[in-house]
């Protein structure tokens, strides 16, 4: 009988949640491929399915559980042999999850994902241990195997793990631990490798970009790791065309940082800056270490020096104790500030967080009303903002055919991040995926722009 080895075993990934979790999936895929596994695109083609879960909010947890159960059904039908549960949900609930999901074969926390090849190999050889939990202290190095799951012209670049903030609504520190920053040298080395592989756009991700390097400098004040120094170093990477920053905390956006972004031809003028609220009392309850005045100062700093900047933010409505008056202050603030993009979440109480233990929780009907009211205000703003682009020519990176029809190409201009923002639909002109082209904008929709490629003689 032929002995099965890693060289003829197939694995499929289901990666849920944020881009930071996706990078962990990419590292697991790279590690397994290096060990001889084949990564396949469909679950029923695989021997093993790894569900990299999200445990951040209630909806994410439900989705993770459902996908695990779906894969368990495939296993019961004999279509796959093994179900591995990895990621944040596993790390957060540990033994409770193991007890509640006997159908799964292995449980790998976010502190052990880097050992996935060894864990799978030992399991295949008959080892009985099925739980692998540890503190999430792992930071990838330049040589860490990784498979870029994005279109070849873009990639996520994770610069740190964990978070030093303690927002009352957030479970991330419980799951991912305290801030651990990678060195600038390691980040730049990975950036160069990605660019050498064809990447034109790097999307910089962490739990808070503006805290980058604080942990390193606290241990050794002579070290240079800081947001500004990292930006300067990445700006020197040859062949890189766009650098996109995600998850900026408002009080960390300094004038020096804004000037570095202003002076760069690579760092796109795009600020992803979750504010969560604007009322001072609600911010205090959320344990957000800022005031409305400080938020407005940060916004003024950006707009004064970069009037063309695209600002994306997100808010939480229905946090415990939020009054109608406090919500209306937020609503008026959104109308006044005219943000380019806004995401809105209904507060979800999380176990073992200060917010989850608070009294005066808001009922679901009120949360839904506030969510819908805020998004209605923002939809009108977004439509107006997009109309301002009509008649302008924008640099666009081509992503492929439209999701709606193969008759249109689809791309993004520098003010659109993948997956969370709209797109540019191109109805005239030809280009290849990954091409940077100039597009003349002829029309707009609520979240998307429409245009035609400018042919340069």
Swiss-Prot record:
Record SMART domains: Elp3
Keywords: 4Fe-4S, Cytoplasm, Iron, Iron-sulfur, Metal-binding, S-adenosyl-L-methionine, Transferase
UniProt EC number: 2.8.4.4
Domain MTTase N-terminal: 9-128
An example Gene Ontology molecular-function term: aspartic acid methylthiotransferase activity
One Gene Ontology term from the biological process aspect of the record: tRNA modification
Cofactors demanded by this protein: [4Fe-4S] cluster
Classification via SUPFAM superfamilies: Radical SAM enzymes (SSF102114)
Residues where [4Fe-4S] cluster 2 binds: 163, 167, 170
Gene3D superfamilies membership: Methylthiotransferase, N-terminal domain, Nucleic acid-binding proteins, tm_1862 like domain
Residues in Radical SAM core domain copies: 149-384
The keyword Cytoplasm belongs to this UniProt entry's keyword annotation: yes
Subcellular location: Cytoplasm
Cofactor note: Binds 2 [4Fe-4S] clusters. One cluster is coordinated with 3 cysteines and an exchangeable S-adenosyl-L-methionine.
Catalytic activity reported: L-aspartate(89)-[ribosomal protein uS12]-hydrogen + (sulfur carrier)-SH + AH2 + 2 S-adenosyl-L-methionine = 3-methylsulfanyl-L-aspartate(89)-[ribosomal protein uS12]-hydrogen + (sulfur carrier)-H + 5'-deoxyadenosine + L-methionine + A + S-adenosyl-L-homocysteine + 2 H(+)
Domain TRAM: 387-455
Xref: InterPro entries: Elp3/MiaA/NifB-like_rSAM (IPR006638), Methylthiotransferase (IPR005839), Methylthiotransferase_CS (IPR020612), Methylthiotransferase_N (IPR013848), Methylthiotransferase_N_sf (IPR038135), NA-bd_OB-fold (IPR012340), Ribosomal_uS12_MeSTrfase_RimO (IPR005840), rSAM (IPR007197)
Described purpose of this protein according to its UniProt entry: Catalyzes the methylthiolation of an aspartic acid residue of ribosomal protein uS12.
Family recorded in the similarity comment: Belongs to the methylthiotransferase family. RimO subfamily.
Protein name: Ribosomal protein uS12 methylthiotransferase RimO
Species annotation: Bdellovibrio bacteriovorus (strain ATCC 15356 / DSM 50701 / NCIMB 9529 / HD100)
């Amino acid at each position: 009988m032929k002995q099965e080895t890693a060289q003829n075993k197939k694995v499929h990934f289901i990666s849920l949640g944020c881009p930071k979790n996706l990078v962990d999936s990419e590292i697991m895929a790279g590690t397994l491929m290096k060990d001889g596994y084949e990564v396949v695109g469909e679950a029923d083609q695989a021997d093993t399915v790894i569900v990299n879960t999200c445990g951040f909010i209630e909806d994410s947890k439900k989705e993770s559980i459902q996908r695990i159960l779906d894969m368990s059904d495939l296993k019961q039908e004999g279509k796959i042999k093994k179900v591995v549960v990895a990621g944040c949900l596993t790390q957060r609930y540990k033994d409770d999850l193991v007890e509640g999901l006997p159908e799964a074969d292995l449980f790998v926390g976010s502190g052990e994902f880097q050992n996935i090849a060894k864990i799978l190999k030992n399991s295949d050889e008959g080892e009985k241990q099925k739980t692998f939990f540890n503190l999430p202290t792992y930071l990838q190095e330049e040589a860490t195997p990784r498979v870029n799951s994005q279109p070849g012209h873009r990639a996520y670049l994770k610069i740190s793990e964990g978070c030093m903030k303690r927002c009352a609504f957030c479970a991330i520190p419980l799951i991912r631990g305290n801030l651990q920053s990678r060195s600038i040298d390691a980040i730049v080395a990975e950036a160069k490798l990605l660019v050498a592989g064809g990447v034109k756009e790097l999307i910089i991700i962490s739990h808070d970009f503006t805290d980058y390097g604080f942990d390193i400098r606290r241990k050794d004040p002579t070290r240079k790791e800081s947001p500004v120094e990292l930006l300067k170093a990445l700006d020197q990477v040859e062949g890189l065309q766009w650098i996109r920053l995600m998850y900026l905390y408002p009080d960390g956006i300094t004038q020096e940082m804004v000037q570095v972004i202003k002076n760069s031809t690579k760092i796109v003028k795009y600020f992803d800056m979750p504010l969560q609220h604007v009322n001072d009392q609600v911010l205090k309850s959320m344990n957000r270490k800022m005031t409305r005045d400080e938020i407005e100062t940060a916004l003024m700093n950006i707009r004064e020096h970069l009037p063309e900047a695209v600002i994306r933010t997100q808010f939480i409505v229905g946090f415990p104790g939020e009054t109608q008056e406090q919500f209306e202050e937020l609503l008026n603030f959104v109308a006044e500030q005219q943000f380019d993009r806004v995401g809105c979440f209904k507060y979800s109480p999380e176990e073992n967080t200060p917010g989850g233990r608070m009294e005066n929780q808001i009922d679901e009907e009120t949360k839904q009303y506030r969510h819908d009211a805020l998004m209605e205000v923002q939809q009108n703003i977004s439509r107006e903002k997009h109309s301002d682009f009509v008649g302008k020519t924008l640099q666009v990176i081509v992503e492929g055919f439209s999701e709606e029809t193969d008759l249109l190409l689809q791309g993004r201009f520098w003010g659109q991040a993948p997956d969370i923002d709209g797109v540019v639909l191109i109805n005239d002109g030809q280009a290849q995926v990954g091409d940077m082209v100039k597009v003349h904008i002829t029309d707009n929709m609520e979240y998307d722009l429409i245009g035609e490629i400018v042919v340069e003689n």
